C-alpha cells in the first residue's frame, strides 16, 4: 500500500509477558509473507531474567516495577479480569521513545480492512484519537444519568465504590466516553505536557474505584483533548449492520470486548476470526479434537435433542453464514474426525457405567 507515492511500512511491536520461543516463532512465521512491508518486535514486561534475543527485548526495570505496582492497586474484579498489560497504556511515550506518533490496539481484535489511514489523521493538540464508546446507544440509553446509574450498578455488583460518585463527574466521563481498544497516539504531546505523570497521579487518586481502570483514567484526564475517530476503526461485531451503526463491510477492525470468539462460537464475527486463525501457524495447535468437542458442545447446548453427529454437521454448515464453520471442512482430516467421534463414544460409555454402578 502507498500514500503519496511512498510505500508504507508496518513496524509491529508486541507487548508480551514471558512469551514462549514457540509462540514467538509462530508470530514471526505469521507475518513472514508480508516481510516486504512489515516486521515484528517484542517487548517483554516480565520481571524475570531474559536472555537477549533478536527482535526481543525486556522492558526497562523501573517501568516494569511501576506497572506492577499500579496493577496491584486495581480492585479484585479488575485484577481477575485483566492482566497487568493494561497498565502499559500509561507509559507509551516512555516505552516507545523513538516515535512521535503510533497506533495501539488490543489483542482481542481482528483487522478486516486497512487501517493505515488512521495514522495520517491530523491529531494537532489532541492526545489521541479514539472511537466513542457505543454500548449505551446499543441498549437505548444515552445520557450521563444513564451512564451514572449503570456504573453504580456495576460498582455494587463487584463490591467497590465508583470513582465518579456524582452526576457532575459522570457528565465529564460521558462527554469523553471513548473505547481504549484502538488509539491513534500523539506521543509528542504526551511528552511535552508530561501526560504520563498526570495519568499515574489520577490513577493513584482513584485506584481501586476505577471500574475500567486505564480507560477511565485516559478518558477523564484527557477530556477535551480526544479526537473522535470513525466507528469503523473499533467496531463491536454485534452492533454492525444495525440502525445507528455502519455495515460490517465498512468496518476496519472488529473488537471482541465482550464474549471472545475462541470461547463462544456463536459470537458474531467468530467465523471471520477463525478464518484468519486457520491461515496462521497456530492452526495445528488450535484445530484439534478438544476444539471439535468445544464446537460440538456449543451447538449441542442450544438443542438437547440434536444427535451428536448431526450437531457436528450443523456446526460446520450453520444456516446463518455469519456463524458458519463450513470453511473448516476441507481442513479437517479423517483422523481428527475419528478421534472426535471416539472421544464422544468414550464419554457415553463412562456415563453408562456410572448409571449401572
How does the language model describe each region?
Residues 109-144:
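Conserved donor-nucleotide/metal-binding helix-loop-beta segment in metal-dependent transferases, i.e.
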Residues 33-92:
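Active-site-proximal specificity loops/subdomain of glycosyltransferases
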Residues 159-164, 169, 173, 179-357:
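A glycosyltransferase accessory/donor-loop signature
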Residues 105:
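Catalytic metal- and UDP-sugar-binding loop of GT-A-like glycosyltransferases, i.e.
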Residues 102:
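Short aromatic/hydrophobic "clamp" motif used to bind/position activated sugar donors
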Residues 22-37, 144-147:
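Short, aromatic/basic amphipathic alpha-helical patches
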Residues 10-18, 130-132:
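Short internal beta-strands
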Residues 1-6:
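Histidine-anchored nucleotide/phosphate-binding helix
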